[in-house]
Amino acid sequence: QKQPIGKTFIKEFSDEDGTTIKIGFVSVCIPSNPKDFVVYDDMYEKISSSYESIKDHVDVVFGLTHATLENDIRIAKLLPNIPLIMGGHEHAHSNNLVGNVQIYKADANAKTVYIHKITYDKHTGKTSVSSELKEINSSIKTDKKVGSIVKKWQTILVAQIKNVIKYPDEVIFEAKTPLD
């Protein structure tokens, strides 16, 4: 069932000694697949107003985007106090630093995931992000709930590809020289 979600999201975490941190999330999406149940506005105005509405109620704000790298770079310049933008759209992983903003994008279709280890100093307000790109493969035990979601979307992906290419796994060329 489709339910409206807020323009921002706040999640509170605590460590072993009870120290808490409030993390705010702001998000935008490009209108690449418009749906009648999704509202698309100017992403720069929306993410700026979302940031302004949440920044004084949390310790740190992160961005979640489905936008082009060019869009994410512009957002990073617009909101230089967001230490991390977790993005998507290009389908190939990337890691970019714009000022003090780290922009990470994993590969599409659950091929990879970035694992972000975040440290926040409550006294200085400094956030440190250490990120690792991890390939999703058989060495990782599948979470049943996540695995069923991935399987559903992989099935949809294969069906959609077969609408365009009858035999998508067919070898059509064998290079004698390795290609980069």
Summary of predicted features, one role per range:
Residues 1-141:
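Acidic, metal/ion-coordinating pockets
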Residues 120-180:
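A short C-terminal boundary segment appended to hydrolase-like catalytic domains
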